[in-house]
Amino acid sequence: MSRLDQINGPADIRRIPAAEWGALASEIRRFLISHCAECGGHLASNLGVVELTMAMYLSFCPPTDKIIWDVGHQSYTHKILSGRKKDFAGLRSFGGIAGFPKRNESPCDAFNTGHSSTSISAGLGMATARDLRGEQHAVISVIGDGALTGGMAYEALNNAGRMKSNFIIVLNDNRMSISENVGGMSAYLNSIRTSAGYNRLKENVAEALSAIPGLGKRMVESLRTTKNGIKQLFVPGMLFENLGVTYLGPVDGHDIKKLMRVFEEARRLNRAVLVHVITEKGKGYRPAERHPDLFHGVGPFELATGVPKKNKHYPDYTDIFSKTLIQLAAEDSRIVAVTAAMPEGTGLAAFGRRYPQRYFDVGIAEQHAVTSAAGLAAGGMKPVVAVYSSFLQRGFDQVLHDVCIQNLPVVFAIDRAGLVGADGETHQGVFDLSYLGCIPNMTILAPKNCWELEEELRFAFSYGGPIAIRYPRGQAYRGLGEHREPIRFGKAELLFREEKTALLALGSMVSTAEHVREKLKALGQPCTLVNMRFAKPIDRELLAELAETHQNFVTLEENVLRGGFGLEVAEWASSKEKELSVTHIALPDAYVEHGDVSVLRQHLGIDSDSIVRVLRDKYHW
């Protein structure tokens, strides 16, 4: 039996002899690499924390002791050591275990995560609850150096310094988030790495002075009384110390015994402690070591080479956005681009290489990204904020307060709108129509295909006010022709005209509606098909025209129904003297779990076959 096969629960690692820890780490890495090569997943970040996770399981006792993983994509070894190795065949698949910690999956998952920079706040709250309940367990928050660029982490550190009981923060420093880190914190942590000799210097000086007969001990005490001044000169973690958080490190994150010693020291302190751990993202798999950004989140790949098994034959929406933005920027020098640590994922990396002075990666800081874009707009530029739908949620007040109240011309390029699949409820982009649609001055569009995205971007930069374009993950739809026409404000596109029933589809659901139309036509029920284009404002003029010859309206959107464009259509219909039937095809008032997008569509009833069944049942066709 392999060492890994002996791990069936959180206590089992403590039965593995210390001499075999290195071999166990190698087995875990081989398992992770082979699994991700077959099924995909977050690879590089997980390869970097194998020894760190082992050291925590050897030093602490989950689930009694609480380990909170910031973001959570690096929790695979944690899931293995807590007894879920047998479930990895279903990792990130519908009905299987999640790729992130989930409290309802295991008692060892202390707190659900998925977004960045939350772990210190959550850990601080859990440590405070522990103290109020008179309990003694440890609380450990594991946060990466990338997540430490998020403002919420500093808000939590500011409060953590007041702790009078033990709370451990593990800073997993691999010099990257998804792409390379940016900003002052990244430079600060780099300076710490280069001054790692401080702790050794401190120990050596104290030992040497103590050996001086008669004067040594008094000199050491004298130095201790002036330690703050000395620290200002030597301590690499003084930023944290000034916040009241004791700094320990930096420590080799791949040396289990050293990690265990520093965890033992950290646990003895009745205050907040930050343990600075240096790890290598992608460790143990050469392609991931060379290109950790490319192996952050991967699909299936060839084990020997790391080359993806599936090659893209057609561009995805992110590619279309990237190419079009560069073309538009060549025509207008006022166009600038902002990303919150997602240059590759949002397609802005190429723009940054072409126009480095007009490109701004602000780190994991969506609030700052939005307001800095507002400042750029107020200063006469034409900014685009490229961001995932689920991450723009984090900057909601800035969209409302800093952009829309002032009616500033900021373009929001909202990638991953709609279902995204395997990353689950924290990443599904199914709320943006709802949280943006309620804001005055905001205009929202969604393209039906790749060519329309190009035209909508061109329109957005000429519009002159806050505007959002939402588009899905994955291959760009190329159906319904390459017909191009200039986008007109608030105007939909009538694709096929029939009578009686009209399908009103938005964005990614236009292609689905086209399949529905074809199937219903074959059943003798031809339908009108409208590409709505604008979720806000809806084309009330076209709807009024259709109401003269149509009785049934069907809205289709890849967003939750509440607050979506379908309810806007229902409100319009209710104001008409003629009684109209409005059917909504949208997502339920629930979080959508992880799984393949096609499986999720069927499960949620928004695939073409499910929609046809709903309409046949309702209208007795």
Regions found by a protein language model. Give the residues of each.
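Cofactor-binding active-site loop characterized by glycine-rich and histidine/acidic residues
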Residues: 42-163, 317, 334-335, 339-340, ...
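Glycine-/acidic-rich phosphate or pyrophosphate-binding loops and their flanking alpha/beta elements
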Residues: 261-264, 296-297, 306, 316-331, ...
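N-terminal amphipathic, basic-rich helices that act as targeting or association modules
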Residues: 1-81, 245-260, 269, 273-279
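Structural signature of the thiamine diphosphate
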Residues: 219-287, 409-414, 433-482, 608-621
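Peripheral docking tails and interdomain loops at the edges
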Residues: 300-304, 308-311, 421-423, 443, ...
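Long, well-ordered, tryptophan-enriched scaffold segments
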Residues: 4, 175-321
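Non-catalytic terminal/interface segments that mediate subunit docking, oligomerization
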Residues: 66, 271, 279-393, 398-408, ...
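Generic long, charged, amphipathic alpha-helical segments
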Residues: 361-362, 514-546
